[in-house]
């Protein structure tokens, strides 16, 4: 376990890989075009997929957690050993978690100097664990309740949470595979803690248009927040994007069609996958603000061979990274 660093050192160290964009301020583009890596890693023996990625940069290295599946469709979770460059992901060790944290979200909660790993399918609808060393896959605390509510008209129940904070509040966003995105909130002074049982619908559309894998970010240098949501299209999974001026505000569609998505087959530049699915934008720093640099957007995502088919929980998902063209 590494010695604990100060809050300032930890937060600043997370910006190392993106420091080149610090001097400039960019707006989000009106249309997106990306380049893509090939698949960056193969699951180790016993796993059929690596999926549902969450990523922070700390001490100049990527820390990536993910869900796993096996040949029977059973879920688990894992973490890669920290690595500096995406090209190193294939050789990074893959470390199974002894207690699963499926569809994870990792971040550093600066006000309490603690790392948070939020996830689903734990003791409550959403749960969280804490740690002083996020690189240790099995160094997390016992599970604590993050959200205990339920939703109607959903075959999955609450799914695919993300957590983000501003100066005064923490917010929980999640999906339900039912065309709705939900939000709950609490005072930042009470976090980490339980968001309770109540939530509100902040977006509503068809199931295919608002399916799952919601993520929310602060846009660096702008009074703006960015939400991305996975959708089901005719050519595969893709992300739609929305913006808002505050985390408690209304969301407006930004890049919302399959032919002009935030990220999808139409604009990903990927040749190995038609699907751009559950992932995480690379953040400026690892803290609860989830800040991204619009001058240097990268998306860690899950993709799969276009010829693969069968039960969703047995599909061979792999990690890839999109880099925004500038």
Swiss-Prot record:
Pfam families: Glyco_hydro_62. InterPro entries: GH62_arabinosidase, Glyco_hydro_beta-prop_sf. It catalyses: Hydrolysis of terminal non-reducing alpha-L-arabinofuranoside residues in alpha-L-arabinosides. Residues 1-24 form the signal peptide. GO terms for cellular component: extracellular region. CDD domains: GH62. Its EC number is 3.2.1.55. GO terms for biological process: L-arabinose metabolic process; xylan catabolic process. It is an enzyme of class 3 (hydrolase). Its main location: secreted. Glycans are attached at residue 307. GO terms for molecular function: alpha-L-arabinofuranosidase activity. It is found in: Secreted. Keywords: Carbohydrate metabolism, Glycoprotein, Glycosidase, Hydrolase, Polysaccharide degradation, Secreted, Signal, Xylan degradation. Transmembrane segments: none annotated. Belongs to the glycosyl hydrolase 62 family. PANTHER family: ALPHA-L-ARABINOFURANOSIDASE AXHA-2-RELATED (PTHR40631:SF1). Alpha-L-arabinofuranosidase involved in the hydrolysis of xylan, a major structural heterogeneous polysaccharide found in plant biomass representing the second most abundant polysaccharide in the biosphere, after cellulose. Releases L-arabinose from arabinoxylan. This is Probable alpha-L-arabinofuranosidase axhA. It comes from Aspergillus terreus (strain NIH 2624 / FGSC A1156).
